[in-house]
UniProtKB/Swiss-Prot annotation:
Organism: Oryza sativa subsp. japonica (Rice)
Protein name per its UniProtKB record: Transcription factor TGAL6
Protein family according to the UniProt entry: Belongs to the bZIP family.
High-level lineage: Eukaryota, Viridiplantae, Streptophyta, Embryophyta, Tracheophyta
Gene Ontology terms, MF aspect: DNA-binding transcription factor activity; sequence-specific DNA binding
A Pfam family hit: DOG1
Spans annotated as Basic motif: 106-126
């Protein structure tokens, strides 16, 4: 085909050929068109000028294509980054909240160390208490063995056929257990007495009356525990309770059936309860009279029991057979079991007296009464200590 002159300079024909061509021009298949295709022109964007009469306008520079592809690639990465920002922010916020809700590792380690130290402290305290109780048991056992050795020395001129004279058998475990419990009870009573004294010195207010009420109830509960311990120990060794070996010498001097006389306590502590109303005076007087009557009845019962046991021992003929002798001794042993009931009834009288005084008196009066009672027993123990520490003549062992 013959081309007319200037055909190659006819830019319009070149443009027509490029438009009508079935395949896109070479510059349209470059890598830049793959990224330029999604680009859309905004409604208010000014279209780029296109020169139609200069072939330079259709000439694509490789550098420009590369830069355009780089720009489009950066824009797509930027859009992808924008889409990822909310999720990252949410995840970071969620992680921050979770971290804030969790204590730091240093705090957790410190808490674990504190728990371990507290556990070891409790174990040491428990071991110390067990060691203390064991030592107290050994001390009580040595004291009882010493007392029985003294009794054996007193009766050393007795029959050689009775080497155990002065001994009543092995030490009862129940008595030793009561010795430890009673020592703890004394500590608790001293603490309650001190708290009552401090509370009474602070004056009278609504809060103070409530505190006094709680202290009075705690003091009464402490005495109730003592009576329960004594009943349990009496079933194991009633003579241990009745003899007062668990008390100081001065307390044993005033002992009545293993404890204090309720009527004597009421008489000695009544001045500490003043002022009393007329009704309270009548009720306290009636309670004291009733206590004296029950005490007399129990004392008479004890005297009768002693006489009955003595009669059982003297009823046996020295020339009777061993079988007849054992029958009389068995009767005497059975009668001794009644001593447990006497101890229980005496403690019941003491308990009822304290409860009736609590009912008759006001909270403040009951607090003063328990304070006076605790101080009363403390002075007995202090008197025994002073007596034991008194100066002795060097010529007397």
């Amino acid at each position: 085909m013959e081309l007319y002159p200037g055909y190659l300079e006819d830019h319009f024909n070149i443009h027509k050929l490029s438009i009508s061509s079935a395949s896109p021009p070479e510059y349209m298949t470059s890598a830049s068109t793959q990224f330029a295709a999604p680009v859309r022109m905004g409604a208010y964007d000014r279209p780029p000028p296109v020169g139609m009469w200069s072939h330079e306008q259709f000439k694509v520079d490789n550098g420009q294509a590369t830069s355009a592809s780089t720009i489009m690639e950066a824009e797509m990465k930027f859009e992808n980054r924008l889409e990822e920002i909310p999720q990252v922010v949410l995840e970071e916020g969620r992680n921050v909240d979770q971290e804030a809700s969790k204590p730091p590792d240093k705090v957790l380690r410190r808490l674990a160390q504190n728990r371990e130290a507290a556990r070891k402290s409790r174990l040491r305290k428990k071991a110390y208490i067990q060691q203390l109780e064991t030592s107290r048991l050994k001390l009580a056992q040595l004291e009882q063995e010493l007392q029985r050795a003294r009794q054996q020395a007193v009766y050393a001129n007795g029959s050689l056929r009775e080497p155990n004279l002065g001994f009543t058998g092995p030490i009862d475990p129940g008595a030793l257990g009561f010795e430890i419990k009673y020592s703890h009870w004394v500590d608790e009573q001293n603490r309650n007495t001190g708290e009552l004294r401090n509370a009474l010195l602070q004056g009278q207010t609504t809060d103070q009356d409530l505190e006094l009420k709680l202290l009075v109830e705690a003091g009464l509960d402490n005495y109730n525990r003592l009576f329960e311990m004594k009943e349990e120990a009496a079933n194991s060794d009633v003579f241990y309770i009745m003899s007062g070996m668990w008390k100081t010498p001065t307390e044993r001097f005033f002992l009545w059936i293993g404890g204090f006389r309720p009527s004597e306590v009421l008489k000695n502590l009544r001045p500490q309860l003043e002022p009393l109303t007329d009704k309270q005076v009548v009720e306290v007087g009636g309670l004291q009279q009733t206590s004296m009557q029950v005490e007399d009845a129990l004392s008479q019962g004890m005297d009768k029991l002693k006489q009955t046991i003595a009669d059982s021992l003297t009823a046996a003929d020295p020339f009777d057979s061993p079988e007849a002798y054992m029958v009389h001794m068995a009767n005497a042993v059975e009668q001794l079991r009644s001593l447990v009931q006497f101890v229980t009834q005496a403690d019941h009288l003491r308990q009822q007296t304290l409860q009736e005084m609590h009912r008759i008196l006001t909270t403040r009066q009951a607090a003063r009464g328990l304070l006076a009672l605790g101080d009363y027993f403390q002075r007995f123990r202090a008197l025994s200590s002073l007596w034991a520490a008194r100066p002795r003549d060097s010529g007397i062992s």
